[in-house]
């Protein structure tokens, strides 16, 4: 488990550069760890073909990939210029009831200090199907820190946009105006703009217009299109989805596209250091199956690394990763990360049985990985 955590901190630069800076375990001659991907036998070939036969297109942000039907989406998140966006199936009656109950909940929330009351500051009725709550960030923080919580109903989909804001218009915050200013009006514009540009989307629907896909919805807008009221003139977009095998819950794929991350090195640069650390720490299950650069349609600077490791479930399993655009980092060329695990439960799998061995063999895992990742590409007209 410790080895996997160390490996993750090196692979994902945003999670911990400290380990790289401190380590001096630069051991040469790692070629002995490169075993290659084993050839599939007939049973393994049938297993992979069963996955391939059911692949269907799935939209992830501004990209798409063909996922086998055996994989179920278990996690989805979208953040655009600090605004968290989500969708939920509902009815108009349930929507109206939710808004009423949410208002009552916020209005009845107490604050730690009397001067920060009321907790619910305002309720903006943008139109008959769109409302925005303006409330304190929490019950303890001064009420200059706000949350704008917007909801919009479109057919049978309720969209939510949540964004932090600052309001120091009250006289007791006069001293703070020297180093920061109220931005609530601008952030309200941002929330309303995002809500207006959201529309429902079916699970396997692939839009042909610029915008971002997320679970249950689509946010229209070009990659270089500014967002009214946002703190930055350019877009910052982060989208992530996790798909878990319905039959083998220790097999999952995680996709992440993040325009805010730009690194000085690449995946293969970092994995050279990771291999040295794994070798020095003595993971008996560690081996490199394949690594190198690869071509993905419409995506530059893509690299992959496929290995065997001792997973967090303390079994021999597979950890595969693709990273692209790591040295570019923009809304038009976001950093892309695709991670595949075999022999380890994802964080979204709360209740699971003990694992004695990984569900797939190395050959099956690599074959499934190739079938999925080689279909990953930029969606037509997405940007």
Positions of predicted regions on the chain:
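Bacterial N-terminal signal peptides that target proteins for export
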Residues: 6-17
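Bacterial signal peptide processing site
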Residues: 31-34
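C-terminal motif of bacterial Sec signal peptides marking the signal peptidase cleavage site
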Residues: 27-29
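A short acidic-to-branched-hydrophobic micro-motif
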Residues: 74-118, 160-164, 238-275, 316-328, ...
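Acidic, serine/threonine- and glycine-rich low-complexity intrinsically disordered segments
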Residues: 174-300
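Surface-exposed amphipathic alpha-helical segments
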Residues: 71, 167-215, 338-383
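N-terminal mature-domain "stem" immediately C-terminal to a signal peptide or N-terminal signal-anchor/transmembrane
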Residues: 40, 45-89
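Signature of long, low-cysteine stretches enriched in small and polar/charged residues
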Residues: 106-155, 256, 260-331
């Amino acid at each position: 488990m410790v080895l996997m955590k160390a490996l993750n901190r090196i692979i994902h630069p945003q999670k911990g550069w400290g380990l790289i800076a401190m380590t001096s375990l630069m051991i040469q001659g790692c070629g002995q760890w490169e075993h290659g991907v084993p050839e599939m036998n007939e049973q393994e070939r049938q297993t992979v073909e069963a996955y391939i036969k059911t692949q269907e297109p799935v939209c992830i942000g501004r990209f798409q990939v063909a996922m086998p039907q055996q994989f179920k989406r278990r996690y989805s998140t979208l953040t655009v210029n600090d605004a968290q966006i989500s969708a939920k199936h509902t009815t108009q009656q349930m929507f109206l009831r939710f808004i009423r109950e949410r208002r009552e909940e916020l209005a009845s929330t107490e604050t730690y200090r009397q001067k920060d009351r009321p907790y619910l500051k305002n309720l903006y009725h943008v139109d008959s199907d769109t409302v925005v709550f303006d409330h304190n960030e929490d019950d303890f923080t001064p009420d200059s820190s706000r949350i704008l919580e917007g909801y919009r109903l479109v057919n049978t989909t309720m969209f939510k946009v949540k964004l932090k804001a600052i309001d120091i218009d009250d006289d007791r915050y006069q001293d703070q105006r020297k180093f920061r200013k109220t931005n609530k009006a601008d952030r309200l514009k941002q929330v309303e703009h995002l809500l207006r540009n959201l529309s429902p989307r079916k699970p396997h629907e692939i839009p042909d217009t610029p915008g971002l896909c997320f679970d249950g919805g689509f946010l229209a807008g070009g990659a270089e299109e500014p967002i009214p009221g946002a703190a930055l003139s350019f877009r910052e977009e982060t989208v992530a989805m996790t798909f878990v095998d319905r039959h083998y819950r220790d097999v999952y794929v995680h996709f992440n596209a993040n325009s805010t991350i730009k690194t000085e090195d690449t995946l293969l640069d970092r994995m050279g250091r990771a291999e040295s650390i794994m070798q020095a720490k003595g993971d008996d299950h560690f081996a490199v199956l394949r690594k190198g650069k690869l071509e993905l349609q419409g995506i530059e600077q893509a690299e992959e690394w496929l290995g065997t490791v001792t997973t967090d479930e303390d079994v021999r399993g597979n950890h595969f990763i693709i990273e692209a655009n790591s040295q570019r980092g923009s809304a038009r060329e976001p950093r892309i990360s695709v991670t595949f695990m075999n022999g380890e439960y994802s964080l979204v799998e709360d209740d699971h049985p003990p694992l004695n061995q990984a569900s797939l063999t190395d050959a099956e895992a690599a074959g499934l990985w190739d079938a999925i990742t080689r279909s990953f590409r930029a969606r037509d007209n997405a940007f």
